[in-house]
Amino acid sequence: MTSNRKNENEIINALSIPTVSNPSTQMNLSPDARIEDSLCVAEVNNIDPFVSASTVQTGINIAGRILGVLGVPFAGQLASFYSFLVGELWPSGRDPWEIFLEHVEQLIRQQVTENTRNTAIARLEGLGRGYRSYQQALETWLDNRNDARSRSIILERYVALELDITTAIPLFRIRNEEVPLLMVYAQAANLHLLLLRDASLFGSEWGMASSDVNQYYQEQIRYTEEYSNHCVQWYNTGLNNLRGTNAESWLRYNQFRRDLTLGVLDLVALFPSYDTRTYPINTSAQLTREIYTDPIGRTNAPSGFASTNWFNNNAPSFSAIEAAIFRPPHLLDFPEQLTIYSASSRWSSTQHMNYWVGHRLNFRPIGGTLNTSTQGLTNNTSINPVTLQFTSRDVYRTESNAGTNILFTTPVNGVPWARFNFINPQNIYERGATTYSQPYQGVGIQLFDSETELPPETTERPNYESYSHRLSHIGLIIGNTLRAPVYSWTHRSADRTNTIGPNRITQIPLVKALNLHSGVTVVGGPGFTGGDILRRTNTGTFGDIRLNINVPLSQRYRVRIRYASTTDLQFFTRINGTTVNIGNFSRTMNRGDNLEYRSFRTAGFSTPFNFLNAQSTFTLGAQSFSNQEVYIDRVEFVPAEVTFEAEYDLERAQKAVNALFTSTNPRRLKTDVTDYHIDQVSNMVACLSDEFCLDEKRELFEKVKYAKRLSDERNLLQDPNFTFISGQLSFASIDGQSNFPSINELSEHGWWGSANVTIQEGNDVFKENYVTLPGTFNECYPNYLYQKIGESELKAYTRYQLRGYIEDSQDLEIYLIRYNAKHETLDVPGTDSLWPLSVESPIGRCGEPNRCAPHFEWNPDLDCSCRDGERCAHHSHHFTLDIDVGCTDLHENLGVWVVFKIKTQEGYARLGNLEFIEEKPLIGEALSRVKRAEKKWRDKREKLQLETKRVYTEAKEAVDALFVDSQYDQLQADTNIGMIHAADKLVHRIREAYLSELPVIPGVNAEIFEELEGHIITAMSLYDARNVVKNGDFNNGLTCWNVKGHVDVQQSHHRSDLVIPEWEAEVSQAVRVCPGRGYILRVTAYKEGYGEGCVTIHEIENNTDELKFKNCEEEEVYPTDTGTCNDYTAHQGTAACNSRNAGYEDAYEVDTTASVNYKPTYEEETYTDVRRDNHCEYDRGYVNYPPVPAGYVTKELEYFPETDTVWIEIGETEGKFIVDSVELLLMEE
């Protein structure tokens, strides 16, 4: 800093300094007399500390250097910047991080815990080592970008450092210690965002995947908002906590406001400009906020004279000082002339002071009219006023003496001398100083040098070149015996010419306008804008900006606006009164919301323009709204030739949208454009930048919506967006009457599926709902989804196409069924395979998927490589399947069934965007082929009808014979379980009741099958109702039975059998009966080995009967008429046997002489009955009961109980006794 002083001395040339009579009080005003780290503080009543210049200077230096490397800097600039940054934050001397922390602690008088301090400092030390290592690797790589080893090292160190700082940031925002840690947090957050920017600058050169670069970019955007909100929130909290009532509290309040603006808010204002996609070239940003140096009043009074310090000298209250000093929000202006008025305080000839008691300041916005403000006493001309000229001059440094005089016992505080050092930024040779100087001989003096509080950005150059702030205004604290000027300052980056330079994006805050139009107000900035902002609530213009165009007038520009709005609106721009842009802009916030970081958006006009004059006036206005709130932060002038990623995205989206439609008719959708592809184009449009192309985005959205409507109209599937999946119908009503006529109607109204098929909301792959089909543990019970396309939707002799998108699948079977079954089995690798469609990316703030992540482009030529019936190893997630339709018949309503099925445990599928569309009319060979197939199908249908008629007649006769009459509500008295099973077997000979591909789908004979099957179910229900033995078929093991000894229930031939292996074992059950009624005890059993198996029925006293089974006996038969059964015994011969009472084996014999080789397809293969070959029986309701194996014997007896309880006991004498069923049936009255 000494060298700076020498340069300045050469300019000032021994300015006169007022003399004092007492050498002991004479103030050394030599240029080297600076206070480096703090102003002198009083020995008593001290305020600790007023300033730490090294803390402030670090913040100023970093912000100043960042302003020079915004956008995309040159490689050399960036390497130099990182070297500077590491040197500033991790120098060889005292740790700046500790100084940051201590400085805020002293300002707010709150210390962090020792653990917090030690943890933070240690972690920052580690970050310093990581940054130094990264910086060195970066410089090495920049020297030779083609060196593979350097590239590998820099990438490795980048990833490690970024992760390290990401995890370190939370250590700098410990709960209840956020304010003292705030300056540390802001600097660390700044480092992180700068580091994340490097991924966008260099990531692809380092070998990062585009998805990784994008992920780092998304993190940068997200953390920019997070860090900004944190800094603003806790800055405001800390500032409000310091709000007090007296002058001393205001002094501390103002120091916090100034120092944390420099060390925190200035950085936050620059964060958005790190976005290289929005700012892809060098960018100039400007800080227009104002800060205030300390009042020029004595603060270093010696012990015993504390009242001579200005804040103790009957100073005004906190609120009075704030009202006098803090300027209301205003347009940025520059001082042009200062007139200072003086008064005299005289005690004696040796103790007197002329001092600053008031002033008039003339100031002007850029290109605007002159304004004047006055403060203090300005009508006293007994002492000649001093006028100082500042027009076109930056006052970069002030030096002021705070004097004190004692009048009787009352101290008087005032300023007898002040020097204003200036330079003309347009002419660096015009520099010097202008001085206010009055006679003074008082009791003490204190020098205030503005560079102590606002030091230059660097000591490498003279301060007239490296100054960071310029004087913008002067306030005055007024008390009875107190006058203390307060200087306000703006940052040097806010130039006074609004110059648009070449090859850069120029940001100009709108508070740099020359005027405000009616209805516009300047409001305080929210903390992250770097200054105040403009607001209006109705249609009109905001203001005019006088621009200085420092580029050829042929250069074309686009304009962007950073704004917040509670409504959709139109912005318009004018150059010299001529409208050049009008565009629609969207709402960014809700009315009544606080202004937050996310409230602001940067959006622009796509139409470029050029300036016609080197000095031009730019006007911004808004229209098409009323009674809403619109805020403007800044406008940006972007060279038109700059290619943004957003511009490339727009061009790509426009091509994609146009490619949806045919070249001959822009309102007609291409046939090969899938519904999934339209959704992806919609995502592409949604990801376009609102800031860059809002109007074009809206226009493209309308086109994509129209394409989506066309896609929906041509799609013959109902509910393609999967709003609902119906469960499987029960095709027989409770009373056994078929309700099949509604099946076709219901099947043609949306999707039907198994219970495990679920609808999922859209993800990063699907924009709309999709379905998942899981695996199954039993191939007889697959998970499925199906829908029928009704005949009325189809055209004769036309080819149709089923297509969709599969995220991933294994063993997914797809069928199209009409005359034949077109079939594919698809295995599609998922997103974590060799064919990823998207990358893992952060979700949005509301949990929405990130559909803007990079993914492979849609390629309609990639398709399934397999043919019908083959297992398909899909390399594309798109699938297609064709089917040809011949003649249509609305009465027959054959339609087309669309089926998806998983029948393996390992299988699964996620699919969506399903379409069934008309592909083309059939001609030539295809037409001939479908006609031939249709004829074969009809021939087979006729044969099936003949067979069905015969089988149906036989089955219906057998079913009718089970019941008393056609009401089907009462069984014949002699109907037994074997007869019911025999009838059911005949019913199941009706073929084509269900489709073999998915036997839950009704076939051509479903109606008659369900009719008869309903009667079978009724018969079983009636039969079960009259059998009073519980669990007589042992299907529930030994439930309801009493057991003595060792017995077991074993599965044999798909039946449950009771096995009694020992003669001492016994099984019994007490059964409630109706005394006086007749019952039939019927037992089906098998005896192995010697001895007898016995089933006994008895009451408590006597009335016992039994059935005996031997190994060597033949199966018993029974008389037809149970009304004459009183005369027969269990051992009667077979003469009385009737065919209705035939055993299971005879009843289940099948006549196959009239079988027809019918298959519901027109394939050339020999037909086989799929149901007979399929071990999975998909029978609705009652499942086919397996016949009793050979060797079992059925016997029965009549029994008339005399009490209400009988006992049935089962045992044997030796060998093994196997019992299939025990029935006790109530006789009909």
From Swiss-Prot:
Keywords: Sporulation, Toxin, Virulence
Keyword DNA repair: no
Pfam families: Cry1Ac_D5, Cry1Ac_dom-VII, Endotoxin_C, Endotoxin_M, Endotoxin_N
GO molecular function: signaling receptor binding; toxin activity
GO annotation, biological process: sporulation resulting in formation of a cellular spore; symbiont-mediated killing of host cell
InterPro entries: Cry1Ac-like_dom-VII (IPR048645), Cry_V (IPR041587), Galactose-bd-like_sf (IPR008979), Pest_crys (IPR038979), Pest_crys_dom-III (IPR005638), Pest_crys_dom_I (IPR005639), Pest_crys_N_sf (IPR036716), Pest_cryst_cen_dom_sf (IPR036399)
Domain of life: Bacteria
Other noteworthy facts: Toxic segment of the protein is located in the N-terminus.
General function of this protein: Promotes colloidosmotic lysis by binding to the midgut epithelial cells of many lepidopteran larvae.
Family recorded in the similarity comment: Belongs to the delta endotoxin family.
Protein's UniProt name: Pesticidal crystal protein Cry1Bb
Protein source organism: Bacillus thuringiensis
